[in-house]
Amino acid sequence: MGGEGDSSQPQSGEGEAVAVNIRCSNGTKFSVKTSLDSTVESFKELVAQSSDVPANQQRLIYKGRILKDDQTLLSYGLQADHTIHMVRGSAPSSAPPPAPAASQTTAPSVTRGVGSDNSSNLGGASPGESLFPGLGFNPLGGGNAMSGLFGAGLPDLVQTQQQLAQNPNMIRDMMNTPAIQNLMNNPEFMRSMIMNNPQMRELVDRNPELGHVLNDPSILRQTLEAARNPELMREMMRNTDRAMSNIESMPEGFNMLRRMYENVQEPLMNATTMSGNAGNNTGSNPFAALLGNQGVTTQGSDASNNSSTPNAGTGTIPNANPLPNPWGATGGQTTAPGRTNVGGDARSPGLGGLGGLGSLGGLGGLGMLGADSPLGATPDASQLSQLLQNPAISQMMQSVFSNPQYMNQLMSLNPQLRSMLDSNPQLREMMQNPDFLRQFSSPEMMQQMMTLQQSLSQNRNTASQDAGQTGAATGNNGGLDLLMNMFGSLGAGGLSGTNQSNVPPEERYATQLQQLQEMGFYDRAENIRALLATNGNVNAAVERLLGSIGQ
């Protein structure tokens, strides 16, 4: 044992060797001496010398968390004579790590002034694998605009698109997260989201076959896959053009396409680019952003041409504008400089057809709130307390906060937050501490911070009204707004779209069961009992399973 401890001493360079207990899944126990400053990867090598489990098959679990190779033992709060549970997992497949988000500066093509509410048009991006990239495509606005997974204060969507091009695995990792899987495999939730829009509801009532398409989870997967893979996107465009050409060459084919345009595509465009009397609020029209900036383009042109404004509001005149490419980035922002983008409409050029997927009003289960949210980007305390109980959101947050690399990439995406952290090294160090992040993201702490933010927001509104200047008092608490928008909205979702009480536990906890099996827990019945007892929380289930071993 002493030799093993000595072998880890030169690597850490500081700290003395301490004894750490290892408990295997078969109930056996042994001790290993190592430095707490050593990495988990080197610690696994030491454990492999005292056990028959290779380092690449070890799954080390401490306090319900799986230790990651690139982290130090001290970062997990490990101390002398503490016990680490070890289970044997399958040998991991060799895969290159995800490329870091390579965008330390803002995109030169996007220049926006920092005003009293410059959170408008700032979308979210996925900083790494399993980070629930917030659908990285949420156009955000101040006031009553829809909030996204990470709230306001993250980079522009053009920058997001550039990063996704450099790291195409982001969307793939996002699709593997429990929250996204729950969304795409929940037809009832998708149906309720679609039916929340009166125009879409009327369109689906007239065309039942369209409802089947919109409720098909495979459509979402195909859309996300096309957005992730440029080659697949171009192939789908070619196939669509070829199919349209073939239909047009058939007898009565042109009339068929014309009827499809009049009965389906034009109403769909109207439903996604207009919101009736709601002031073009994306909160009242959850599908307003699916086609990027098409609505902004038409309304921007209408603002300059008063004769066409009444027709645009009624929707009775056929659309004479060319339809946008639903798989490509829209060019609607060409007319955007001519109009003031206030909270009611904060859509940005999207990532292809997913341009505003983050602002869908029905995506409450993914961290978005309704348009009646008082702060626009964070929920109230009672809502947060309820939604944070969702195991998928808890797992997502723990995945984010347990890896400082995610936080570094996330913080580097926003110029304002990055400059604030650069000017305060102590704050940056705190934001890179996993223990602090987990404590900061606890429901109790977030409720206290939200209460403080609400008080500051009310004081700011009062001061701005007294001074006659909008946002006159935003400068002092802008950093708090950024941090709370980033942390508060991370947990502001509960996947509570439908009641899952009648869903069998094998289906309800399919993702969690797969995770437990990958960790080395192969007793499916015992895993289901543990998940039922912990309401689907994988970490708590692991603690329960490990506690029952050897007893």
From Swiss-Prot:
SMART domains: STI1, UBA, UBQ
Membrane spanning residue stretches: none
Tagged with keyword Cytoplasm: yes
Sequence ranges assigned to domain STI1 in this UniProt record: 143-184, 197-236, 373-410, 414-449
Main subcellular location of this protein, as a coarse class: nucleus
GO function terms (MF aspect): polyubiquitin modification-dependent protein binding
Every UBA domain range: 504-548
Pfam family, one: ubiquitin
Subcellular location: Nucleus; Cytoplasm
Residue ranges, compositional bias (Low complexity): 465-475
Residue ranges of the region described as Disordered: 88-127, 294-336, 455-475
Tissue occurrence: Ubiquitous.
Biased amino acid composition, Polar residues: 294-319
GO cellular component assignments: cytosol; mitochondrion; nucleus
SUPFAM superfamilies: UBA-like, Ubiquitin-like
Occurrences of domain Ubiquitin-like (ranges): 18-93
The entry's keywords: Cytoplasm, Nucleus, Repeat
Domain of life: Eukaryota
UniProt keyword Transmembrane helix, yes or no: no
Quaternary structure note: Interacts with 'Lys-48'-linked polyubiquitin chains via its UBA domain. Interacts with RPN10 via its ubiquitin-like domain. Interacts with PEX2 and PEX12.
Free-text function comment from the UniProt entry: Binds and presumably selects ubiquitin-conjugates for destruction. Prefers multiubiquitin chains rather than single ubiquitins, with a binding affinity for 'Lys-48'-linked ubiquitin chains. Acts as a ubiquitin receptor that associates with the 26S proteasomal docking subunit RPN10 for the indirect recognition of ubiquitinated substrates of ubiquitin/26S proteasome-mediated proteolysis (UPP).
Protein name: Ubiquitin domain-containing protein DSK2b
Lineage: Eukaryota, Viridiplantae, Streptophyta, Embryophyta, Tracheophyta
